Amino acid sequence: VAWNWKANGAGSANTDGDINSTVSANTTSGVSILKYSGNGTGSQSIGHGLGTKPTVLIVKCRTGGAESWVWWQDTSGNGTADQRLLLSGTQANYGNNFVTFQNTTFTTPSTNDTAWNGGSGTYVAYAFAEKKGFSKFGKYDATGTSNDGPFIYTGFSPAFVVLKRFNSTE
């Protein structure tokens, strides 16, 4: 099975923020794909093209490092990603290097890391904003029982669900 999101073609230059990016954004579905080159400095803003605050940001270093995919998520709704996960590892919630989301940009953590803004790296990022009936992001607390499991209200019938435990290395 392949899941594909249509953004908006080949992309166009975006000069919002400290680091220029090439952005292909579909504001109707809240999906943006962007490419940028790192500058090795912390707390850098990068344009995402959505026109609204994303809820999830997924970043991968394409060159200049052998880093995992990093997933940031704002589960509190305050514009700061309070959850950070490595998608290809077994680590739990990964440290306190958080991204902040604005309507036109996201700001990288204050620390410099090749996973999101190394000086010699090129990056691809996927930004997702919640759209009623299309996407919903959140978290839940499992009960630890083997019954039917929790009910998670999304407001629609999802076709694609991503689950990853963030409080344990299991």
Describe each model-derived feature in a short phrase.
Residues V1-E170:
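Surface-exposed molecular-recognition determinants
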